[in-house]
């Protein structure tokens, strides 16, 4: 993909649309095995060179302050696979590895980051009467490093996990999914994340879903808040940033409408509510020359509704 035509329709001397050169290569292999057991491997490579900024910018200005520009080189490769063990029970080993490298500048502020993620899990899928049970164990390796003040040393952690899920089919119209996941993070201790999902299908054209659960997320500040890298404001981190934690619930209604001429319309409506016990929200208002980050004082909520027609 290539887009290299700078546009400035509002005449502010800044590009209106990000310019980019991108290449992506993907390949998947499926292996034929006895008893139709699954074994597949897929690989992908991605490279992108994107920039935006003043209309006069070109790569010779990269990293300087003579002409402002934001330039990002991204190189990423990943491999993933799924292997069904040659045993009577249905047990799969799933694995993946990704390597992500970002070389970027925001004016004369460099942001250099590397992330490597390795993942493997064993999943046992067992059907018993009206129950479809998934039982599994996983391990995740994460390496992250960048050149910002928020990362004094490379962040390297291995997180083991256990999880169980039971989907109960009461009738053809109703089912209930119960799940629990346990992770151990050496930085944050024991992490439990339960979830519940109810599905009701009163007709072939109507589906109602109700989901609830908890959330836990470690924030990588500068990968998510690029405004902190532009150099326009000083970045202030007032305390050690804790993980974001939340409780959430959402309801979804899906309606299919068939017309006599053969056309199909799908109406999708969702509403959600999230209660955060901690969230990392940038403060742009206290000081116009600073972006201040700290842990949430109290709680925060997020509510919303969406409607889509397809």
Region locations from a protein language model:
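Sequence/structural signature of outer-membrane beta-barrel proteins
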Residues: 2-10, 48-52, 98-107, 141-148, ...
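Outer-membrane beta-barrel transmembrane domain signature of Gram-negative proteins
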Residues: 64-86, 95-177, 297-308
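Membrane-embedded beta-barrel scaffold of Gram-negative outer-membrane proteins
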Residues: 1, 90-104, 201, 209, ...
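Flexible loop and strand-edge segments within Gram-negative outer membrane beta-barrel domains
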Residues: 3-24, 30-91, 97-116
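One face of beta-strands
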Residues: 52-53, 120, 178, 196
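Outer-membrane beta-barrel domain signature, especially the mid-to-C-terminal portions
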Residues: 10, 14-19, 52-56, 68-70, ...
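Structural signature of Gram-negative outer-membrane beta-barrels, strongest in the C-terminal barrel
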Residues: 34, 42-44, 83, 130-134, ...
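Short beta-strand-initiation
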Residues: 24, 76-78, 119, 236, ...
């Amino acid at each position: 993909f290539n887009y290299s035509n700078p546009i400035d329709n509002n005449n502010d001397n800044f590009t209106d649309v990000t310019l980019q050169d991108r290449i992506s290569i993907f390949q998947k292999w499926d292996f034929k095995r006895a008893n139709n057991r699954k074994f597949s491997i897929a690989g992908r490579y991605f490279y992108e060179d994107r920039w935006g900024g003043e209309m006069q910018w070109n790569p010779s200005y990269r990293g300087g302050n003579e002409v402002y520009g934001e330039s990002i080189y991204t190189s990423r490769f990943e491999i993933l696979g799924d292997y069904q063990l040659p045993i009577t029970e249905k047990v799969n080993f799933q694995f993946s590895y990704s390597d992500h490298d970002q070389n970027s500048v925001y004016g004369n502020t460099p942001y250099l980051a590397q992330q490597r993620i390795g993942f493997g899990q064993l999943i046992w899928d067992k059907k018993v009467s009206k129950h479809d049970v998934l039982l599994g164990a996983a391990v995740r390796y994460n390496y992250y490093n960048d050149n910002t003040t928020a990362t004094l040393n490379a962040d390297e952690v291995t997180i083991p996990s256990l999880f169980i899920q039971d989907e109960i089919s009461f009738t053809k119209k109703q089912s209930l999914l119960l799940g629990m996941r346990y992770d151990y993070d050496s930085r944050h201790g024991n992490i439990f994340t339960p979830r519940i999902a109810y599905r009701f299908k009163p007709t072939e054209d109507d589906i109602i879903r109700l989901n609830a659960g908890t959330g836990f997320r470690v924030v990588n500040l500068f990968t998510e808040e690029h405004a902190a890298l532009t150099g326009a404001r000083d970045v202030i981190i007032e305390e050690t940033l804790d993980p974001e934690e939340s409780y959430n619930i959402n309801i979804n209604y899906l309606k299919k409408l068939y017309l006599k001429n053969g056309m199909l319309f799908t109406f999708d409506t969702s509403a959600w509510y999230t209660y955060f016990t901690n969230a990392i929200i940038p403060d742009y208002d206290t000081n116009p020359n600073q972006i201040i980050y700290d842990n949430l004082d109290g709680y925060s909520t997020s509510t919303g509704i969406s409607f889509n027609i397809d």
